[in-house]
Amino acid sequence: MSIIIPANSAVGGGYAVDNSCRFNNASDDSLTRSLGASETSLKKGTLSFWIKRAEAVGTAMWIYSNEVDNDNNRAYIEIDANANLRVLNSQGGANPVYFITDAEYRDFGAWSHFVIAIDTTQGTESNRVKIYNNGVQITSFSQATYPSVNTDLKLFEGGQTNKNHIGNIHGQSGKLSAYLSEFVYIDGTQNAATDFGEFDSDSGIWKPIDVSGLTFGNNGVYLDFEDSSALGADVSGNSNNFTVNNLTSIDQTTDTPTNNFATLNPLYKQDGVFSEGNLAYTISASDFDSALS
């Protein structure tokens, strides 16, 4: 059963995603906001996003981060230098939430969907953190640290200024080189993957569904990237807008989870440099390198 959307394809019927946002590490692209102090919950929340990577394996890519005061009190989601998904919540010198997947996410030609759903009030430890990829719960980890029951998490804590990021982490290198689409943060609820997607009845491909009717909570956000003049615009109804850093209208794309475009493949290269979401390949005047899609 296919559970990713391969290159040069579209998912027929149902909900259509019109836009994505292209992040380029070389341009220091990111989105930033000040997370509000009136959280719906410090114990429950969900992040959901579709991603199509553009950075070659060997470079860490920060997807989402929230820093409360310093390196000892922050949380982040990244695809690390080994292409594993990593979820960390660090506070007070400890890591009450720390997960590294065994699976490696190296595909440059396909869109992939992730859901990180947390509820520390759950009595069963394994129910407190659930991570899904393309509709399937991940159960194989090289690192799996579950929070104690009723733990308040820095991942959900607000009140800080300009330290809630998409595509970056405060004061660190390794910004995101990827396309992002349908980015959702739910404040106060542990959602299932089926709140964000479904398997196509004909192809079996995991595809997005309309999320506009979800309850987002006080600090919740939904970025659909449909306004090229305001790529950080929140359409959840909360107006929890992000500030755009170095992104411009040309970084809005129509390469989406329901309309996947072919891009150049950075796994096949010589001395050239890929950029702009693997749409550009730069070589020196003396080189005769080529690139493949």
Feature locations, PLM:
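Beta-strand-rich, repetitive solenoid scaffolds
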Residues: 5-7, 22-24, 63-67, 75-80, ...
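Extended recognition patches within non-cytosolic domains
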Residues: 2-19, 26-27, 123-125, 130, ...
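Extracellular glycan-recognition modules
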Residues: 28-88, 122-125, 189-194
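Low-complexity, glycine/proline/serine-rich flexible segments
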Residues: 1-43, 84-87, 91-95, 159-165, ...
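Short hydrophobic/aromatic patches on beta-strands that form ligand-binding or substrate-lining surfaces
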Residues: 47-53, 114-116, 166, 180-185, ...
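Extracellular glycan-interaction surfaces
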Residues: 2-25, 48-57, 76-151
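Extracellular glycan-interaction patches encoded by glycine-rich segments
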Residues: 152-180
